[in-house]
Amino acid sequence: MNSLSIFFIVVATAAVCLLFIQGYSIYENYGNIKEFNATHAALEYSKSIGGTPALDRRVQDVNDTISDVKQKWRCVAYPGNGFVSASIFGFQAEVGPNNTRSIRKFNTMAQCIDFTFSDVINIDIYNPCVAPNINNVECQFLKSVL
């Protein structure tokens, strides 16, 4: 055996030992790791201390660039029937004749989620809380879900 092969054997043995030590460390602290993950799971996609948003970049959606919770779009059950997509900006809207806007309602939560978080840019928004309708039922509902 020459010195080069001995060197590679020592390096390989050290690497294997480090892997075993790391594996044993994880094995010994597995309960603590699970407890830490359970405690901090709600903060997984929250804004980090450094000011950079910690975002899930695997899937692009409308909430990725928003850090204010009230501005984020969400699907909520609408009184009576169906679901609506809401944020502080208002509701996703259906545009009718003469450019009249009404709240877009969905039959299921899955339909609401698919529409709200699809790749299509949904720019039709109906905000019932602008003058002169500040105290109507739709505005009160919007304020209650934010």
Swiss-Prot record:
Disulfide bonds: none annotated. The chain crosses the membrane at residues 1-21. Contains two intramolecular disulfide bonds. They are created by the viral disulfide bond formation pathway, a poxvirus-specific pathway that operates on the cytoplasmic side of the MV membranes. One of its GO terms (biological process) is symbiont entry into host cell. It is found in: Virion membrane. It is a single-pass type III membrane protein. GO terms for cellular component: membrane; viral envelope; virion membrane. InterPro entries: Poxvirus_A28. Residues 22-146 are virion surface. Keywords: Disulfide bond, Fusion of virus membrane with host membrane, Late protein, Membrane, Phosphoprotein, Signal-anchor, Transmembrane, Transmembrane helix, Viral envelope protein, Viral penetration into host cytoplasm, Virion, Virus entry into host cell. Envelope protein required for virus entry into host cell and for cell-cell fusion (syncytium formation). Part of a stable entry-fusion complex (EFC) which is at least composed of proteins OPG143, OPG147, OPG155, OPG086, OPG094, OPG107, OPG104, and OPG099. Formation of the viral membrane is necessary for the assembly of the complex. Interacts directly with protein OPG107. Belongs to the orthopoxvirus OPG155 protein family. This is Envelope protein OPG155. It comes from Camelpox virus (strain CMS).
